């Protein structure tokens, strides 16, 4: 009788968890990233592949002529690849006056260490310089997120991939809701995704753009530090497939392999709850997030600085 009650309770818990996730009632349900597939590729819950490139800057001063050359070069070289329905690109730009002091302090770390080695007490001078420079600087970061989605596959390929994944999960017999689904990736997408990443890297390099494809640990750290910088240490790194695990089995361990696998990536990326302030804004720690939509695009191509100059005074 007890076993029947336990089974019914487990089924109800599973159904309620699935319903809660489907209705987006938990903050983790908004995270689409499931696990890592390779050194520089993440996997979404539906099997799509994701890579993140960090733009460090350009190798020359950019005026209007250089800007148009870079724009036209990217457009000409990537039009065919991005014309396919399954490839998409997201661009993230971040600006913060709060982070700049820490960045400048890190840049001065070698100088401070040299002064310490020479036993020179110039802390007051360094603090004054740090404060002065901070008043004239802002922290900026740019990331390009490349997606290769299931729609790249033919109907037969997609059905076969879904069937194989379902069979593997049933065969392994673990609960992918509480751990990372290490077989989430769709093998047929790998070559297509890797080809696009390689092509994009070569195009950016040829145009003088300094870009780096992040390894999965740095990529997840970047995501979390953007979402919740107050709760993310510089040395924090996610636990991903291939990393060493030190599982602690509970006294109620019933042999479910999910308890000794890598923990859910959604829980690692979103470490604490968010608060809905209204239908349009959400608060995470000390930050408030909201959406901005551009309904009518300009007829002529303009630099991002045009938009940036208009939004900066608003304090966004």
Indicate residue ranges for each PLM-predicted region.
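Extended, folded cores of ATP/NTP-driven motor/assembly subunits in large transport
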Residues: 2-316
């Amino acid at each position: 009788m007890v076993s029947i009650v336990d089974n019914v309770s487990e089924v109800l818990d599973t159904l309620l968890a699935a319903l809660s996730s489907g209705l987006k009632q938990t903050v983790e349900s908004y995270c689409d990233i499931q696990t890592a597939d390779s050194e520089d590729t993440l996997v979404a819950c539906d099997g799509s592949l994701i890579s993140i490139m960090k733009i460090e800057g350009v190798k020359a001063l950019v005026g209007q002529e250089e800007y148009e050359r870079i724009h036209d070069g990217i457009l000409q070289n990537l039009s065919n690849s991005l014309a396919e329905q399954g490839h998409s690109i997201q661009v993230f730009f971040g600006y913060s006056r709060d982070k700049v002091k820490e960045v400048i302090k890190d840049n001065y770390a070698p100088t401070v260490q040299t002064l310490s080695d020479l036993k020179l007490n110039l802390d007051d001078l360094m603090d004054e310089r740090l404060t002065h420079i901070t008043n004239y600087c802002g922290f900026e970061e740019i990331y390009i997120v490349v997606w290769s989605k299931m729609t790249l596959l033919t109907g037969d390929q997609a059905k076969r991939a879904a069937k194989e994944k379902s069979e593997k999960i049933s065969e392994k017999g673990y609960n992918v809701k509480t751990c990372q689904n290490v077989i989430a990736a769709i093998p047929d997408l790998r070559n297509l995704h890797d080809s696009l990443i390689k092509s994009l890297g070569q195009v950016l390099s040829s145009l003088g753009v300094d870009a780096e494809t992040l390894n999965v640990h740095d990529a997840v750290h970047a995501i979390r530090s953007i979402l919740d910088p107050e709760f993310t240490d510089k040395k924090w790194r996610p636990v991903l497939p291939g990393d060493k695990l030190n599982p602690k089995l509970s006294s109620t361990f019933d042999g479910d392999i999910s308890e000794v696998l890598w923990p859910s990536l959604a829980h690692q990326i979103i470490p604490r709850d968010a608060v809905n302030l209204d239908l349009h804004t959400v608060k995470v720690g000390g930050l408030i997030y909201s959406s901005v939509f551009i309904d009518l695009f300009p007829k002529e191509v303009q630099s991002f600085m045009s938009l940036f100059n208009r939004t900066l005074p608003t304090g966004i």
